[in-house]
């Protein structure tokens, strides 16, 4: 069991690393503090892109895009997996993403991913995933 703290980690780099780990092993991966992951780039552009993605399609036929930060992170990881095939479905079943830290994982040691740290950003432009989901109307 691996517990990853997403606090201050870049969303895409975190997602790609987790996707590789899920496909290569049989270990369950828990991600906590999903709302504190960051998306690099301009605030206005990022919010506009996520709003457009959310509003694409219809309520009847989709595509359906989540509002909550834990679901957005899980959807991002899903996009990096062959989720329509058996090994991708198995990998997704081993992934759990949480907003905050649940009580059963409070005493567990968490790890961080050095390659995904936001201090590696060359620019100071970023927005937290929790703020993006709040702007889209989430009440997490």
Curated annotation (Swiss-Prot):
One of its GO terms (molecular function) is mRNA binding. SUPFAM superfamilies: Ribosomal protein L13. Pfam families: Ribosomal_L13. It comes from the Archaea. Gene3D superfamilies: Ribosomal protein L13. GO terms for cellular component: cytosolic large ribosomal subunit. InterPro entries: Ribosomal_uL13, Ribosomal_uL13_bac-type, Ribosomal_uL13_CS, Ribosomal_uL13_euk/arc, Ribosomal_uL13_sf. Signal peptide: none annotated. GO terms for biological process: negative regulation of translation; translation. Keywords: Ribonucleoprotein, Ribosomal protein. Transmembrane segments: none annotated. The keyword Ribosomal protein applies. Part of the 50S ribosomal subunit. PANTHER family: LARGE RIBOSOMAL SUBUNIT PROTEIN UL13, RIBOSOMAL PROTEIN L13. This protein is one of the early assembly proteins of the 50S ribosomal subunit, although it is not seen to bind rRNA by itself. It is important during the early stages of 50S assembly. Belongs to the universal ribosomal protein uL13 family. This is Large ribosomal subunit protein uL13. It comes from Methanosarcina barkeri (strain Fusaro / DSM 804).
């Amino acid at each position: 069991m691996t517990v990853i703290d997403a606090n201050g980690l870049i969303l895409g780099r975190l997602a790609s690393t987790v996707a590789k780990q899920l496909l290569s092993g049989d270990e369950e991966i828990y991600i906590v503090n999903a709302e504190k992951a960051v998306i690099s780039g301009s605030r206005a552009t990022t919010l506009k892109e996520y709003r457009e993605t959310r509003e694409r399609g219809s309520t009847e036929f989709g595509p359906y895009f989540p509002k909550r930060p834990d679901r957005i992170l899980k959807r991002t990881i899903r996009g990096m997996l062959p989720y329509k095939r058996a090994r991708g479905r198995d990998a997704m079943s081993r992934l759990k993403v949480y907003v905050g830290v649940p009580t059963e994982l409070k005493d567990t040691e968490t790890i961080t991913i050095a390659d995904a740290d936001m201090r590696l950003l060359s620019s100071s432009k970023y927005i937290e995933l929790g703020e993006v989901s709040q702007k889209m109307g989430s009440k997490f």
